[in-house]
Amino acid sequence: MTELAEQVSMPEGQQRRGGYVPPHIRNGGGRRGDSAPRGGFNNGGGRGGFFRNNGDRGGFGFGGRGGGFGGNRGGFGGNRGGFGGGMRGRWVDGKHVPGQRNERIELELFGAPEDPSFQSSGINFDNYDDIPVEASGEDVPEAITEFTSPPLDSLLLENIKLARFTKPTPVQKYSVPIVSKGRDLMACAQTGSGKTGGFLFPVLSESFLTGPAEKAANDGYSYQRKAFPTAVVMAPTRELATQIFDEAKKFCYRSWVKPCVVYGGAPIGNQMREMDHGCDLLVATPGRLNDLLERGKVSLSNVKYLVLDEADRMLDMGFEPQIRHIVEDCDMPPTGERQTLMFSATFPHDIQHLARDFLHDYIFLSVGRVGSTSENITQRILYVENRDKNSALLDLLAASNDNLTLIFVETKRMADQLTDFLIMQNFSATAIHGDRSQAERERALAAFRSGRANILVATAVAARGLDIPNVTHVINYDLPSDVDDYVHRIGRTGRAGNTGVATAFFNRDNNNIVKGLYEILEEANQEIPPFLEDCLREVSFSRSGSNRSTRGNRSSNTRDYRKHGGNGSFGQNSRNSSWGSARGGGFGGSTGGWGNDRAGGSAGGWGASNTKTSSWW
């Protein structure tokens, strides 16, 4: 093992990962796995292509245990029995009537206790008890300390228990009482801190307790073909949207709430047919939601809850006109008549000023800072010239013991080239970027999550929001130009209180990020290599624009601008309610893509409708 490899050792207690091979492909092939542009990966010396067509057996799709979403072997809604019938709850005479329990469905949704692909989000959350929290605004409700009824609905508590969530995260401790009191919320929390549960738990709990909004008068055929969701969740990428939908299915189990997901890159016809069966909670990317609104397939008149996840990225990267059209120009109830929740890792001043138009009498919640990840993520910065990166990468992978490794590059071309290189070196690798079709992206993510491909090469499309359990090593093969994007990337490991390693290849081409990188390492009490200090002195002396690598002072990115001279329209008074003192910092970003929202792609995938069967939700 070379000196470079010895610089990065995996955390103690991690075992070498065993490769599970699904039964239907154990005796496969003799040909080499698919090359990177087709989304495949090498399987230990050419045991066969993983993404081959297995016909009616369903393949290794997103149904997971025995088939795809519509395969004849089962999955979510397979021919051996869907999730329909008495397992759906109902709202009858002002009361919520839960559906019947079903062990098979619970295994599909929540997994077996020993199944690593259904990682409990309660693992190591004791590490988060000391994270500082600051809540500002008028009459901030008292935080909860455990999952109880009240304030949460009893059915939701049962589903939370099935998901093996043992205690709320800091953001959930505040978001639950805030939403239950009918308040709007702007939540700024570190990545991996349970933001998805932070809005799903209170929104679903209140929906279970209060039921759907009263629908408009039936106008005939068009009414039957239009969805009237009670809650709308918008996310910037299709990957994040499908991930939220995957979680929503768990917590909507046995309830009257039927979740749906819509996003670009998949056939819109399948998504519309799925909504025809009911849509109470709609998870959507802004582009596809606008399309459905223009087609008259969705009405927002019944929306009680609007959630903007990764809100800073959606607004900052160009989605503001689409979001404003959805919120202000369509039939959504106005501000004050709905609850609006905005969740992200940072809210810089300019984003907060844009967001104020969507919020009313809101509470600003800031949870943690960059330094709070110091116990979970070990950051290593290596000086590597561009010509030496491949060699250094092989050294790191040789020391990784087949653990899940996520490698970030800056360009789509490099993602494919590097994946092909790793396959030629007999590594099981696959790639995800914006030029891949939706089917290829979903297959790549499925392979990586399952461990069949233990290396995923990604561009910024996978940098935000994705929650992939058991990623133990993140490698920044190419450092981003914005320090906040670096923070989001390394946040793919060390999630849910678990430990991980983040390695970055640095050279003189990265001087634009050196100041922010130095500050992050210093705040997190990480080792700062001497070459980084030298580069910082050079950059500071030459004034070569290091300040452009961050959006002003990083500490302001998690602070409520109303408390620091902001001219917001919601009043100037604020009250603090905190565990310890908030320390600023946090996770965020202002650059990077959000994926390709073009038409085309594959039928099926996460949440896509299957024409043979109907799903329980």
Curated annotation (Swiss-Prot):
Compositional bias of kind Gly residues: 582-595
Binding site for ATP: A189, Q190, T191, G192, S193, G194, K195, T196
Biased composition (Low complexity): 543-558
Compartments, as annotated in UniProt: Cytoplasm
Occurrences of domain Helicase C-terminal (ranges): 376-536
EC number, UniProt record: 3.6.4.13
Xref: CDD domains: SF2_C_DEAD
Gene Ontology, cellular component aspect: cytoplasm
Motif (Q motif): 145-173
Catalytic activity: ATP + H2O = ADP + phosphate + H(+)
Coiled-coil spans in chain: none
Record has 4Fe-4S as a keyword: no
Stretches for region Disordered: 1-53, 543-617
Electron transport in keyword set: no
Ranges for domain Helicase ATP-binding: 176-365
Keywords assigned by UniProt, alphabetized: ATP-binding, Cytoplasm, Helicase, Hydrolase, Initiation factor, Nucleotide-binding, Protein biosynthesis, RNA-binding
Name of the top EC class for this enzyme: hydrolase
Motif DEAD box: positions: 309-312
Similarity comment: family membership: Belongs to the DEAD box helicase family. DDX3/DED1 subfamily.
Purpose of the protein: ATP-binding RNA helicase involved in translation initiation. Remodels RNA in response to ADP and ATP concentrations by facilitating disruption, but also formation of RNA duplexes.
Domain notes: The Q motif is unique to and characteristic of the DEAD box family of RNA helicases and controls ATP binding and hydrolysis.
Name of this chain's protein: ATP-dependent RNA helicase DED1
